Design a protein with these regions (language model features):
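Transmembrane-helix motifs of polytopic, lipid-linked glycan transferases
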Residues: 113, 121-145, 153, 184
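Hydrophobic/aromatic-rich transmembrane helices and adjacent perimembrane loops
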Residues: 128, 132, 329-382
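Start-transfer (signal-anchor) and selected internal transmembrane alpha helices
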Residues: 1-43, 143, 231-235
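Signature aromatic-anchored transmembrane alpha helix within multi-pass, membrane-resident enzymes
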Residues: 31-35, 149-152, 237-241, 374-408
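Short acidic/glycine- and proline-prone juxtamembrane loop motifs at membrane-interface regions
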Residues: 166-175
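Short helix- or helix-capping micro-motifs
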Residues: 151-162, 201-205
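Specific aromatic-rich, kink-prone transmembrane helix
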Residues: 137-141, 157, 176-201, 215-223
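Membrane-lumen/periplasm interface segments of specific transmembrane helices
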Residues: 41-44, 52, 57-60, 231-334, ...
Length: 457
């Protein structure tokens, strides 16, 4: 017969067993979210590629990677078509045009060999893989600082955001490397792991000519949150900001005038006065912006509705916590400032395009640090209910927006008038296009509309 003490011990053992089982389930929650995200995103990306829903930018990056793989570094005739020499001067596109004058992206060379292994599927694999890996590193950041449940909720919120899903389903972008670089650098800073710190800090500005701004933001955050490390903070600020200045004013003009005469004009032409077509350097634009404070304030808040929706869209999956976190504004503030001040044919405040990757890491980290500093860093039942509703709403808004027509096989592109092609018809369309391309001689020059560009690149 068991006495009362034996029963108590047995009950305690059972409780401990249940707690360990629950802990294991929670620990696996982030891996399940990452796996589901990767499978769905990659499946949709491959479907888009087959049915010709990938766009011009996808073709550019495939061409750049393929040419670089064969020793023609960063060359792209597709990028030449968009250059200022063609658009403004009326010249013909140039086969040997080097894209570094438009965007300075040395880290693309890391992924060029994969094009020889996976072919056209390489870039979707890289994009989905990097974004998924970033989520796993985010969990590695959160796990020692938050209860298991909160860490898992945070990672699920990261993967459920329209601001992450939308651009992941779009054309390949060099900015898909940014979230992983940010989280790796933060892991190195928080755990004093110098190898990760150096790797993240060195690679981040090399992703694109403007990503050094994120490094400046991290340096500012370090100055505020860890003042005893002010020397390291100043090094990060100097390296990130200095690289942006040198890259845009010295290195890129060596290849072309596209940055000053096209991108600065398209994105910040409203600050350049009566004759913006003359162009300006990044330093010149910065001077013009801050010399017009009334216009600056107007651009920051106008249009107010779109600006507010943009912030709410980023913060919705995190239950709006990033909006009240100082860390968010320190880490994402400089990027938000640039987006709010910019204009362009690609709306900088669209929640489903590549520019959101400049902001997503700051919002995720802002939520993480906010929960870490709470006396009770675990959401209660009511908060979990509200958070679950926010996650559901975020996913619902993402699906109904049909980002980059990724879900066009199950939902119409237009209701009035009704425009929808069945999956079978889309599949046969892609098959027919590939059959048609087989008759083109290998040495022939080719002109094509946008859906065929990735196939020909």
């Amino acid at each position: 017969m068991l006495d009362a003490l034996d029963w108590a011990r047995l009950l305690l053992a059972r409780v401990n067993q249940l707690q360990r089982w629950e802990g294991r389930c929670r620990i696996k929650g982030h891996a399940l979210a990452a796996g589901l995200f990767a499978v769905v995103m990659l499946g949709l990306q491959l479907w888009k590629s087959w049915v010709l829903l990938a766009g011009y930018d996808q073709g550019i990056f495939q061409q750049v990677a393929w040419n670089s793989l064969h020793g023609r570094w960063f060359e792209s005739s597709l990028s030449s078509q968009l250059s200022t020499n063609v658009v403004h001067a009326g010249e013909l596109p140039f086969v040997g045009y080097e894209r570094l004058g438009q965007h300075f992206t040395p880290t693309l060379l890391l992924w060029a060999p994969l094009l020889g292994v996976f072919g056209a599927a390489a870039l979707p694999v890289v994009q989905v893989g990097l974004i998924t890996a970033a989520g796993l590193v985010l969990h590695r950041l959160a796990a020692p600082r938050l209860p298991a449940r909160t860490a898992n909720w945070l990672v699920v919120a990261y993967f459920a955001g329209n601001a992450l899903i939308g651009p992941t389903l779009g054309n390949f972008s060099d900015l898909c490397q940014l979230p992983l670089a940010v989280f790796v650098l933060m892991l190195g800073l928080l755990e004093s792991r110098w190898a990760l710190t150096v790797a993240g800090a060195l690679l981040m500005p090399l992703i694109r000519e403007d990503t050094g701004v994120i490094l400046v933001a991290i340096g500012l955050w370090l100055l505020v949150r860890s003042r005893e490390r002010w020397r390291l903070a100043l090094v990060l600020i100097a390296w990130g900001g200095g690289w942006v200045v040198v890259c845009t004013n010295v290195l890129m003009p060596l290849f072309s005038d596209d940055n000053s005469k096209r991108f600065m004009v398209e994105n910040f032409g409203q600050y350049l006065g009566a004759d913006p077509d003359k162009g300006s350097s990044s330093l010149g634009v910065l001077k013009r912006v801050f010399s017009q404070p009334v216009l600056l304030v107007q651009q920051l808040i106008d249009p107010p509705g779109k600006t507010l929706r943009y912030l709410l869209g980023h913060s919705l999956p995190f239950l709006f916590v990033p909006l009240i976190s100082l860390d968010t504004w320190l880490l994402a503030g400089p990027s938000l400032l640039g987006l709010f001040l910019a204009q362009g044919t690609n709306d900088p405040l669209a929640i489903t395009i590549r520019y959101t990757w400049l902001v997503v890491p700051g919002f995720a980290l802002g939520a993480l640090f906010w929960w870490e500093r709470r006396a009770v860093p675990s959401p209660g039942p009511r908060v979990r209910l509200a958070w679950g509703a926010a996650l559901t709403l975020s996913l619902l808004l993402t699906v109904t927006s049909n980002p980059h027509r990724s879900l066009s096989m199950v939902m119409p592109d237009s209701i009035s008038p009704w425009v929808h092609a069945s999956p079978a018809r889309q599949w046969s369309h892609g098959l027919g296009a590939r059959e048609a391309l087989k008759v083109i001689p290998e040495t022939a020059s080719v002109a094509a509309n946008t859906p065929l560009v990735p196939l020909l690149a």
